[in-house]
From Swiss-Prot:
Example GO biological process: killing of cells of another organism
Organism annotation: Naja haje haje
Name of the protein this chain belongs to: Cytotoxin 5
Cystine pairs: 3-21, 14-38, 42-53, 54-59
Gene Ontology MF term list: toxin activity
Other notes: Is classified as a S-type cytotoxin, since a serine residue stands at position 27 (Ser-29 in standard classification).
Amino acid sequence: LKCHQLVPPFWKTCPEGKNLCYKMYMVSSSTVPVKRGCIDVCPKNSALVKYVCCNTDKCN
């Protein structure tokens, strides 16, 4: 699995066990991702932060 890093088109190959790509947004500015990468479990959204997770190559 390969996930984008903070600035596409750059990406990295995910380590073993981290099988999801994710994007993290601040709820206040939901158009600009704050963080991207590989993760093992999709975090829950909170009042301030929203996560978008997916399990295909470079989908974040």
